[in-house]
Amino acid sequence: MMRLSRNLRRCRWLVFTGWLLALVPAVYLAMTQSGNLTGGGFEVAGSQSLLVHDQLDAHYPDRGAPALALVAAPRPDASYQDIDNAVALLRQIASELPGVTEAPNPTQRPPQPDRPYVVSLRLDARNAGTSDVAKKLRDRIGVKGDQSGQTANGKVRLYVIGQGALSAAAAANTKHDIANAERWNLPIILMVLVAVFGSLAAAAIPLALAVCTVVITMGLVFVLSMHTTMSVFVTSTVSMFGIALAVDYSLFILMRYREELRCGRRPPDAVDAAMATSGLAVVLSGMTVIASLTGIYLINTPALRSMATGAILAVAVAMLTSATLTPAVLATFARAAAKRSALVHWSRRPASTQSWFWSRWVGWVMRRPWITALAASTVLLVMAAPATLMVLGNSLLRQFDSSHEIRTGAAAAAQALGPGALGPVQVLVRFDAGGASAPEHSQTIAAIRHRIAQAPNVVSVAPPRFADDNGSALLSAVLSVDPEDLGARDTITWMRTQLPRVAGAAQVDVGGPTALIKDFDDRVSATQPLVLVFVAVIAFLMLLISIRSVFLAFKGVLMTLLSVAAAYGSLVMVFQWGWARGLGFPALHSIDSTVPPLVLAMTFGLSMDYEIFLLTRIRERFLQTGQTRDAVAYGVRTSARTITSAALIMIAVFCGFAFAGMPLVAEIGVACAVAIAVDATVVRLVLVPALMAMFDRWNWWLPRWLAHILPSVDFDRPLPKVDLGDVVVIPDDFAAAIPPSADVRMVLKSAAKLKRLAPDAICVTDPLAFTGCGCDGKALDQVQLAYRNGIARAISWGQRPVHPVTVWRKRLAVALDALQTTTWECGGVQTHRAGPGYRRRSPVETTNVALPTGDRLQIPTGAETLRFKGYLIMSRNSSHDYADFADLVDTMAPETAAAVLAGMDRYYSCQAPGRQWMATQLVGRLADPQPSDLGDQSPGADAQAKWEEVRRRCLSVAVAMLEEAR
């Protein structure tokens, strides 16, 4: 990964160009090809319903339920003339579309003002897709969003119903839902990212990658939709996964990049190190999610297959953007991605202090592992218990609100023709030798028809119709219940059990809309255990390769199963039991049958993100120390904040779709949000450390023969050590405020100016590098201890420690002031007119420091800053210099300042002959400060008190210098 990262950094403009070239056609496809998505795709290969459907298409061109229908629903004040005009208008609109004809319906009564009227339509071969025709019809009758069309006088409402209309309405709804969800998601994600990174520039990087991921994936989906069945719900899946994973993956890498910068690495090296660790974890996690989602293909239905394909594409593109675009972006905007802004850093407590909370937390958990593990497991099992009462169903119509025009149109058609008229049960009777209409088969067909009439919920059975090849007979039964009602499914089950008993040698297949849905649900229920086993095995193998531990891989799979079970339980509580009705979630009789397998594969894959990210961090530490408890504490301490932030983002994304989406999307959103929340908290932060503390060395058990078989990953190779040399690095646990961006900018500018003014400066070790970061004379370690113990909340803002960058800015300001007050070249000097002439005898002493942005630069040492300020006192004798000097010595012991200033004569000498040594003169100035501008100060009592404090501090240093001279 490090080699790949280096290549991507070098060729970053080529990387940007490649992704830009992928974006352009994706945007075009999104604008032109979205109409290819369908609301169907629930056919099951080899099922009776699909066989009947195919036979009807092949041999019964004029039979079956109408593809589309137009409905005129009169209002109470409508007249005969109004309904007649409305029906005539619908027939005229239908006749204007090529390939659309009216299908006669013998059960339809003449138009009446107290009853809706249905105009059934058929489409010929020129209209392969009913969705496009439905869109045209909806536009022509005036359907707007979820509102029906109406006649000119508004007395008759107009609707389009049928499978094509459902697809068109679902496509419009999902587009609207995605827009609503993103209006909710993006601001929340931005707020979380700004809180995490403390910088709008850094927060913009994951959002930009998320947008790129979603747009490109949508383009790929629309390309596939031109060649295969793609469900309308795939767009919601792509948007959910694309945003959540792209943001999460880039967040992992950016957080590690900043951590490597804090360790002292230069920005290019920090990028490579982040990619070799978090970048590799992202790739492994993405591959695990993709492998888990392939389990959906075992169900082998077009709808689920298309949704899995969309999710897989979203994961793959998110993984690729994170692994390729992130290094290129960091190479281009390294400083912007690294720095934090005090303006958007909302908490006064620094981010680094959070690790101490997690350190104490994991220590508390590991000291009582049995209790915490038992408590966490109990919570998960209680959450999972309602899953045993889950009822599965499937209804595209019920994905719409009850007031939606597609629902009210279907209700009007049911009122006109009966609830089961638009979805009759279709019984196909086949004879091996053909001749279905032959007299010898009439008795068999009559017996089957008689038996159908005895089935529950059957209202009428139409006379048999024969295939154009005379190989089969079709019997249509109209039910008294809606085709999507659970009672209709009972009828299908009864027919499939009873009809073969009276069919003799004939083959009986039961189809129709209800049978189609039932076959789909049965296939999902039958194959879900297989999907579970497949996904669990894939996850186990990926964890085994990543972590090289049998126990940890098994534990990871088991913990994820608990998270999935808790998510299933939440579905029952929220939707079946209606506990969240107050939040706007509808109470449903059943959970959509597509949701459990999708949630299983999705959450299994997503949970592996945190499992791999946490355990690889623990393993990385274990390889260095060999101590399990230390490795667990370190892994949780360094990754808990990242995991929590990533989980918050993912939960926000899923909740956005849950609140804005159709019931199927809402169910997926709720389940995934609960699974991620449980996994990132109860599992990763309680069960993982507790179980690892229980099993200690067994955590790393791996048979020798298996170790030789497993492929090696880069986690086993330690990162190159940071070559700091004499560079001063800000401690990772430094308890200080975030440096203001202005300070960072000024330090960079001032350091560059210092290099020009003092080109012969030398670098030395600076024991006073962090002097001034503590307040009121506190040592740095005391201030750190206060923060670690939580005392910092009681410290006023004025007493809080100062960030080293702010201190270094002040040092550079003093140095530039002194260097611009006088200049020297080869011993030459230009003296200030207000004071005696002094000559610099030795080069300026500086030290190398590393900023949080990764920049390395030279600043004056703490001792040199004191000498510069002493020089300014002697040169200008201003009250401002005395006050600055007092502030400098206030951060250290007077003896320390005296030891530095006592050696002034090695750095400066007096130009005038016969003058005293500079250190001796400085003692006199400090013992009795008499600045030349003392009369210009404010005469107030506060100013006088402050000046007396300055005199006291200067005197303490003068006394210490005299003591030093003894």
Curated annotation (Swiss-Prot):
Effect of loss of the gene: Inactivation increases mouse survival. Mutants show growth patterns similar to the wild-type strain during the active growth phase, but they are attenuated for survival in the chronic stages of infection.
UniProt entry tagged with the keyword Transmembrane helix: yes
Membrane topology summary: Multi-pass membrane protein
GO CC annotation terms, alphabetical: cytosol; peptidoglycan-based cell wall; plasma membrane
Subcellular location, principal: membrane
Location(s) in or outside the cell: Cell inner membrane
Domain of life: Bacteria
Recorded coiled-coil stretches: none
Pfam families, alphabetized: MMPL
This protein's UniProt keywords: Cell inner membrane, Cell membrane, Membrane, Transmembrane, Transmembrane helix, Transport, Virulence
Transport recorded as keyword: yes
Transmembrane segments: 13-33, 188-208, 214-234, 235-255, 279-299, 311-331, 373-393, 527-547, 557-577, 595-615, 646-666, 668-688
Cited PANTHER family: MEMBRANE PROTEIN MJ1562-RELATED, MEMBRANE PROTEIN YDFJ
Function: Part of a heme-iron acquisition system. Receives heme from the heme-binding protein Rv0203 and transports it into the mycobacterial cell. Contributes to virulence.
Family classification: Belongs to the resistance-nodulation-cell division (RND) (TC 2.A.6) family. MmpL subfamily.
Protein name per Swiss-Prot or TrEMBL: Heme uptake protein MmpL11
Species per Swiss-Prot/TrEMBL record: Mycobacterium tuberculosis (strain ATCC 25618 / H37Rv)
Lineage summary: Bacteria, Bacillati, Actinomycetota, Actinomycetes, Mycobacteriales
